[in-house]
Every structure is written in structure tokens, then in C-alpha cells.
From Swiss-Prot:
CDD domains to which the protein is assigned, alphabetical: 7tm_bacteriorhodopsin
Gene Ontology CC: one annotated term: plasma membrane
Protein's job: Light-driven proton pump.
Taxonomic placement: Archaea, Methanobacteriati, Methanobacteriota, Stenosarchaea group, Halobacteria
PROSITE patterns membership: BACTERIAL_OPSIN_1 (PS00950), BACTERIAL_OPSIN_RET (PS00327)
Protein name in the entry: Bacteriorhodopsin
Main location: membrane
Gene name in the database record: bop
Segments passing through the bilayer: 19-37, 52-70, 87-104, 116-135, 143-162, 181-199, 213-232
């Protein structure tokens, strides 16, 4: 009964929007190689955490974009009498990569386990309910699940600008400044995801056709993953302050 509104998956083919999926695959792969190169020679374990997490983010995203571009990560869902193309691998990507992005931010801010668990719990709930929205077979149900997912996003952003930002203010000024830049980037980009969803084919409004919807998600993904990682890992001196937050008195 609870899953009655979910449509069974059907085979689907990738259309002309595949160009954006291949660009996403290449972009994420290049980002991964860049981060691996930046991480060579880093010996401090705390600094290595940032490199490892960020490399996994773009590696997972590259694999999921490849899955979508080659037609594996796509299905069709019947909504009324219309077949919608749904890239389910996008949700698999987000399910793994967005918690890792939040973990990067949390480590930078020096958050405790409760704050990290709250952020990741809200994030997984947000992505899960978003996936249910995408796979639902009635327009009203899709919008309802989108609203629930968006509510989880707002709650997550509330914790991000509240508790996590308070933690960051207790760090060294340059660490707090870097956190602020990355936090603002995440807020701006993540807020656009539900907007693109509701305006695109998945939101059933169809103001954005699938071709441009796919392009928009690709640009957001590259900015939120590769762009985020570039800003974070270029600030090696700041990461050194995170690794050694206090200096021994001389």
C-alpha cells in the first residue's frame, strides 16, 4: 500500500542530453585527477582526510555520470499517460557524495559527532525522499514528496548556518573564512537543485525540457563537487591550521 504510487521501472534510452552527461563524466574525472595530484606528498593524517573525502566525491560522481551517459543509470516512469525519463543514478550519486561534502565542511568547522550525525541524517532523508518523488507515478504524489525533500533541505541548511557556523567561528580566522566561503557556495548551489527539479520534467511542469534540465544539473554538480574541492584543497596553509589548531608555546 505504501508503495502503490511508485511506478515500476522500465527500460529507457539516453537522448541528445547525453552530451551533458559525457561532459559531466569528463569534468568529474579531471577533478579527481587534479585532487589526486594535489594530495601527493601530504603526510599529515588530518590533512589527508580532506583529500581522501574530496577524491571520493568526484570519483563516485564520475562513475555515476558514466552510468547515465552509457544508458545504465536511466529508467522511465509512467506519470499518467506520459513516460518520464528518470536518471536514477543521479540520486545514487547524491546519496553518497552529499554526505561526504557535509563531512568535509564538518571537519573544517570542528563539529562534534552529534552535529555531523544530524547533518548526514537530514541529508540522506532529503535524497531518499527526492528519489521517491522522482519514481512516483502521480503528479500530486511527486510534488508532495518534493515538498518533503525540500523541507529536509531547509532544515539541513538551518543547521549549517546555525550550529556548524558557530563551531567554525571558534576556529582560527583563516579557517573560519574558508568555511564561510564553502558554506555559502553549498547554500547557493543546493538551494537551486529543488528549483531545477520542480521546473524540469521530473517536476512534471516541463518548463525546462530534459535537455536543459540535464545541463543545469551537470553545471550544479560540477560546481558543488569539483568547484568545492578546488577551493578547499587549494587552501593548503589553512588545512595545515586545521591539522594543528594550536601551536605549542615557545
Amino acid at each position: 500500500m505504501c508503495c502503490a504510487a511508485l511506478a515500476p521501472p522500465m527500460a529507457a534510452t539516453v537522448g541528445p542530453e547525453s552530451i551533458w552527461l559525457w561532459i559531466g563524466t569528463i569534468g568529474m574525472t579531471l577533478g579527481t585527477l587534479y585532487f589526486v595530484g594535489r594530495g601527493r606528498g601530504v603526510r599529515d593524517r588530518k590533512m589527508q582526510e580532506f583529500y581522501i573525502i574530496t577524491i571520493f566525491i568526484t570519483t563516485i560522481a564520475a562513475a555515476m555520470y558514466f552510468a547515465m551517459a552509457t544508458g545504465f543509470g536511466v529508467t522511465e516512469v509512467m506519470v499518467g499517460d506520459e513516460a518520464l525519463t528518470i536518471y536514477w543514478a543521479r540520486y545514487a550519486d547524491w546519496l553518497f557524495t552529499t554526505p561526504l561534502l557535509l563531512l568535509d565542511l564538518s571537519l573544517l568547522a570542528g563539529a562534534n559527532r552529534n552535529t555531523i550525525a544530524t547533518l548526514i541524517g537530514l541529508d540522506v532523508f532529503m535524497i531518499g525522499t527526492g528519489a521517491i518523488a522522482a519514481l512516483s507515478s502521480t503528479p500530486g504524489t511527486r510534488i508532495a514528496w518534493w515538498a518533503i525533500s525540500t523541507g529536509a533541505l531547509l532544515a539541513l541548511l538551518y543547521v549549517l548556518v546555525g550550529t556548524l557556523s558557530e563551531n567554525a567561528r571558534n576556529r582560527a580566522p583563516e579557517v573560519a573564512s574558508l568555511f564561510g566561503r564553502l558554506r555559502n557556495l553549498v547554500i547557493a548551489l543546493w538551494f537551486l537543485y529543488p528549483v531545477v527539479w520542480i521546473l524540469g520534467t521530473e517536476g512534471t511542469f516541463g518548463i525546462l525540457p530534459l535537455y536543459w534540465e540535464t545541463a543545469a544539473f551537470m553545471v550544479l554538480d560540477l560546481s558543488a563537487k569539483v568547484g568545492f574541492g578546488v577551493i578547499l584543497l587549494q587552501s593548503r596553509s589553512v588545512l595545515e591550521r586545521v591539522a594543528t589548531p594550536t601551536a605549542a608555546p615557545t
